[in-house]
């Protein structure tokens, strides 16, 4: 079957950053119906809820809008007078509701040009759903200290067929107190922080990356970049991991196949590489019944790709404007569909007005991207890809010379098979993104692995079935002189199996489906293990325990 047919359930898309409340921690079992009805459980994830510090807090409404088209909400932000800071934590919360019929839609929110939220929406039931998302935005404290312009957009289409209006409210809650120190120097998902002079979790400055050159403070001693990289917004880049070279008879083409790599450069020189996360949106794999209650990993939490650019700080500290640019390797020339808004997070040396140093090492391997097509029944595309980059530099700070070395290694393998007409379409894929950051005697090693294993089939009876497994894993170890190694492990998995009658009105689909969402996190401070299971839109298990 043509990709346009089999993927017709996924049109425009979007993404959300944050954690949905997981609900009750006790096991729970409701009796599911024989098939999906006109209503189902509100969207929920197994992600851990955010902790909130005790003490005084203040709430500010950041945006409130009903999105019917592509008109952005524009407003203004003023810091809370009753909670002037410092802030131990700032929590963004999005509350949404929608009913009727609608696709999943892509959205983002900026304050003074700094993107602090990227989000997508769930698909509604005819009777209506509500959902809530929370995100820790403490790292944007520099932006939130000052009044600024707010812009939010969740592009939507409302007409006689697609009736769902997206009603959204976004708030910020400011918890007063001193922010905690960061757990380590790596960019593996925790709050930033490191030994010696930059053990502060919250950066001193946050600068949006735009088309214009950027000028950084001359006493910058640590520099991260974050990129909210999403392949979405229509066209085949919404499911880039399924694209094939031009020679293969498949409906989604990309001359170089499915390998993608998010790159950041400074003044035209490669400064960082990363594997994009293969997000499956809430209409993905031709089957919205997989996602109505439990979205896949990160589908409601667009986490930015993060780079440690500290080796380049000496070059940027000259007081002159510099070009910082983001690109996605593997995207066909002229092809749209990727969004890569980026921010720079900077820590300053408060003991020195100017920090000098040098970039001392820049070494990369030749990028590998080898898609091999084999004709037959089924057709098959085997792809391998990879790249490695090492950069090193030093800074002469007020607390001595500090050398930072960053090594990033990417590896990808996938096997994509499909039949003529694409009535059967299957993919098994793995992305590895390994990073080592050494600075001031502290080494942080992070091994990230993302997996996808799924198959969609369309039978002679027009029953469309999707069986899919997704994995999001990260293993981070911090080595400090004279101390035991500190390890953090994340293992977030999703499995689903859903079937419905294709090409008929919604009330004739006779859909059935089961899903399991399990989030496991083990840190030096303890563990978290939460499992959600659904059947036909009913939550049949909600259990926690390590």
Residue ranges and their predicted role:
Residues 90, 207-208, 215, 238, ...:
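Feature for soluble, non-membrane regions of globular proteins
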Residues 1-29:
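Secretory targeting and sorting signals
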Residues 151-223, 347-398:
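Flexible, low-complexity coil/linker segments
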Residues 204, 209-211, 233-241:
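A short secondary-structure junction signal
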């Amino acid at each position: 079957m043509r990709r346009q047919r089999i993927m017709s359930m996924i049109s425009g898309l979007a993404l959300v950053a944050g954690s949905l409340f997981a609900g009750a921690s006790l096991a729970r079992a409701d009796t599911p119906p024989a098939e999906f009805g006109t209503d189902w459980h509100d969207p929920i994830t197994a992600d851990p809820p955010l902790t909130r510090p005790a003490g005084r807090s203040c709430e500010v409404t950041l945006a409130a809008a009903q999105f019917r088209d592509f008109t952005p909400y524009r407003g203004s932000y003023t810091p809370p007078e009753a909670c002037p800071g410092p802030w131990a934590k700032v929590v963004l919360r999005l509350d949404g509701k929608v009913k009727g019929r609608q696709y999943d839609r892509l959205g983002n929110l900026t304050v003074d040009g700094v993107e602090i939220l990227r989000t997508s929406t769930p698909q509604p039931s005819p009777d209506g759903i509500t959902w809530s998302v929370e995100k820790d935005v403490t790292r944007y404290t520099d932006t939130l200290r000052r009044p600024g312009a707010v812009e939010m957009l969740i592009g939507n289409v409302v007409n006689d067929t697609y009736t769902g209006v997206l009603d959204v409210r976004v708030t910020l809650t400011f918890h007063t107190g001193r922010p905690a120190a960061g757990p380590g120097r790596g960019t593996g998902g925790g709050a930033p922080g490191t030994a010696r002079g930059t053990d502060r979790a919250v950066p001193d400055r946050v600068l949006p990356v735009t088309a214009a050159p950027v000028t950084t403070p001359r006493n910058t001693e640590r520099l991260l970049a974050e990129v909210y990289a999403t392949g979405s917004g229509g066209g085949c880049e919404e499911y880039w991991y399924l694209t094939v070279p031009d020679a293969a008879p498949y409906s989604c083409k990309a001359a170089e196949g499915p390998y993608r790599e998010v790159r950041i450069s400074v003044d035209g020189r490669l400064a960082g590489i990363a594997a994009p996360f293969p997000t499956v949106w809430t209409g993905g794999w031709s089957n919205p019944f997989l996602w109505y209650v439990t979205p896949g990993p990160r589908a409601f939490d667009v986490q930015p790709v993060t780079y440690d650019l500290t080796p380049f700080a000496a070059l940027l500290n000259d007081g002159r404007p510099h070009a910082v640019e983001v690109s996605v390797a593997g995207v066909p020339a002229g092809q749209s569909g990727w969004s890569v808004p980026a921010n720079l997070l900077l820590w300053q040396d408060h003991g020195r007005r100017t920090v000098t140093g040098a970039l001392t090492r820049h070494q990369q391997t030749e990028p590998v991207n080898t898609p091999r097509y084999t004709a037959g029944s089924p057709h098959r595309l085997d792809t391998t890809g990879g790249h490695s980059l090492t950069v090193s530099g030093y800074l002469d700070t007020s607390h001595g010379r500090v050398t930072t070395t960053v090594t990033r290694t990417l590896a990808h393998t996938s096997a994509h098979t499909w039949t003529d007409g694409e009535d059967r379409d299957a993919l098994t894929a793995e992305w590895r993104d390994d990073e080592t950051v050494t600075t001031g005697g502290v080494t942080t090693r992070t091994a990230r692995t993302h997996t996808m294993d799924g198959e969609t089939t369309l039978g002679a009876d027009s029953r469309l079935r999707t069986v899919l497994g997704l994995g999001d894993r990260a293993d981070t170890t911090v080595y400090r002189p004279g101390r035991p190694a500190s390890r953090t492990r994340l293992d977030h998995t999703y499995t689903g199996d859903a079937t419905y009658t294709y090409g008929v009105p919604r009330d004739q689909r006779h859909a059935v489906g089961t899903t399991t969402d399990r989030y496991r996190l083990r840190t030096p401070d303890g563990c978290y293990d939460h499992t959600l299971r659904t059947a036909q839109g009913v939550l049949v298990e909600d259990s926690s325990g390590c």
